[in-house]
Design a protein with these regions (language model features):
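Buried hydrophobic positions in well-ordered alpha/beta secondary-structure cores of metabolic enzymes
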Residues: 19, 89-90, 173, 199
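An extended, acidic
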Residues: 135-242
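DPxDG-like acidic metal-binding loop motif
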Residues: 75-129
Length: 242
């Protein structure tokens, strides 16, 4: 695993070094058929990371949000697989907010090899094999896709946040800054895979489509409903507030 940990660190450095070029493309916006934004920064960063990985991982099967085609392979195969969302939370990003992230998950066949979450403008990252500083919270984070379950969850009381970035939510539920993260409408593999694998590594309770998640590959051709709870009982001296 050690060489791959080094590779993930190098990807983080690659993104950090590219940040000025990414930010320079922030407000060059186009609109997808579903009405969501995509910026030149999304395209630039996906192309940069894909090229860098292809030079280092032989016969790589690359799955990226901005380049994935519906006719492409959707099941894991022998060899290296990379699943990337170059800028998760594009609406935040192109609005000038700093709560956006990079999500990368690497697999060898059906076996997870390592994952990385980055919050580049906030200067933070989380990756496979690295320790995390755990905190505690009573906040539930919700996805920004409006769904009746979100409205009822907020109406039922308690602290709730809609933060507009799956990477930010996944990063924070893994370390305990969110007690729970819920996306009842569903998100794509590139939005979720790195984050759910890191949450799995750190002992969170994870439900995908209503079933316990055991760390399997998520196909890129469909959406997944996710519910993650931080396990405060697994680290001493911590517990949910309230």
């Amino acid at each position: 695993m050690q060489p791959l940990v080094s590779l993930l660190h190098d990807v983080r450095t690659l993104v950090e070094d590219a940040l000025p070029s990414v930010l320079a493309r922030r407000y060059d916006i186009r609109w997808k058929p579903d009405g969501s934004p995509v910026t030149e920064a999304d395209i630039y960063l996906e192309t940069l990371i894909a090229g860098w990985l292809n030079d280092r991982l032989p016969d790589l099967d690359f799955i990226g949000e901005e380049s994935f085609g519906k006719t492409e392979r959707v099941e894991p195969r022998d060899g290296w697989i990379a699943v990337l969302d170059p800028i998760d939370g594009t609406e935040n990003f192109c609005s000038g907010l700093k709560e956006w992230g990079v999500s990368l998950s690497l697999w060898h066949g059906a076996d997870h090899a390592g994952s990385l979450l980055m919050l580049p403008e906030l200067g933070d990252a989380m990756m496979t094999g690295n320790p995390i500083d755990r905190v505690r919270s009573r906040i539930t984070g919700y996805s920004s896709s409006i769904h009746p379950a979100i409205l009822s969850g907020i109406a039922d009381g308690g602290e709730a946040r809609i933060l507009g970035c799956a990477v930010y939510n996944l990063f924070n539920v893994t370390r305990g800054a969110l007690a729970r993260f819920v996306n009842p409408k569903g998100a794509q593999s590139w939005d979720l895979l790195a984050g759910v694998m890191l949450a799995h590594e750190h002992g969170c309770d994870i439900s995908i489509d209503g079933k316990a998640y055991e760390g399997t590959f998520l196909r890129p051709d469909r959406r997944y409903r996710v519910d993650i709870r931080h396990r405060y009982d697994l680290h001493s001296g911590q517990g949910p507030i309230g």
